[in-house]
């Protein structure tokens, strides 16, 4: 029996919406990365993008466990000498709540061109409203 390999033309991609209210960051990110990658589907093929589109709403209401709110840091470097910036989780939640979820999920996806293509299917919104209603997303309870 030959191994199954999915064809790009035969793949149907669905839209899912996830509410991040009171969800733990890492647990949500790992579940979302599985749906983005398509590992929940029986026709999963590692070298083809078979995953679905994911919309995450209420990103500003995500939580972390333990002391990570004070002790977790996000780093950014401008490329110049001494140009490193260090932000706490609390600061990022106030100013850029969508970047926290995007960064967590991006680290769980493949590195390379396929990972970049998969990452573009993730849409994150800080509050309850989003502009993708025309896609008719199905709500997922994770």
UniProtKB/Swiss-Prot annotation:
It holds the Pfam family Ribosomal_L13. InterPro entries: Ribosomal_uL13 (IPR005822), Ribosomal_uL13_bac-type (IPR005823), Ribosomal_uL13_sf (IPR036899). One of its GO terms (cellular component) is cytosolic large ribosomal subunit. Transmembrane segments: none annotated. The keyword Zinc does not apply. It comes from the Bacteria. Keywords: Ribonucleoprotein, Ribosomal protein. One of its GO terms (molecular function) is structural constituent of ribosome. One of its GO terms (biological process) is translation. The keyword Oxidoreductase does not apply. Belongs to the universal ribosomal protein uL13 family. Part of the 50S ribosomal subunit. This protein is one of the early assembly proteins of the 50S ribosomal subunit, although it is not seen to bind rRNA by itself. It is important during the early stages of 50S assembly. This is Large ribosomal subunit protein uL13. It comes from Buchnera aphidicola subsp. Cinara cedri (strain Cc). The gene is rplM.
């Amino acid at each position: 029996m030959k191994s199954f390999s999915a064809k790009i033309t035969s793949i149907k991609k669905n839209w899912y919406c996830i509410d991040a209210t009171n969800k733990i960051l890492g647990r949500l990110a790992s579940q979302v990365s599985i749906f983005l990658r398509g590992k929940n589907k029986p026709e999963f093929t590692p070298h083809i993008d078979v995953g679905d589109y994911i919309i995450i709403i209420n990103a500003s209401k995500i939580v972390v466990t333990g002391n990570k709110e004070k002790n977790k840091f996000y780093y950014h470097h401008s490329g110049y000498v001494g140009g490193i910036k260090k932000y706490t989780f609390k600061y990022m939640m106030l100013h850029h709540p969508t970047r926290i979820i995007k960064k967590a999920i991006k680290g769980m996806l493949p590195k390379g061109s396929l990972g970049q293509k998969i990452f573009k299917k993730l849409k994150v919104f800080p509050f309850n409203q989003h502009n993708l209603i025309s896609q008719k997303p199905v709500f997922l309870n994770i």
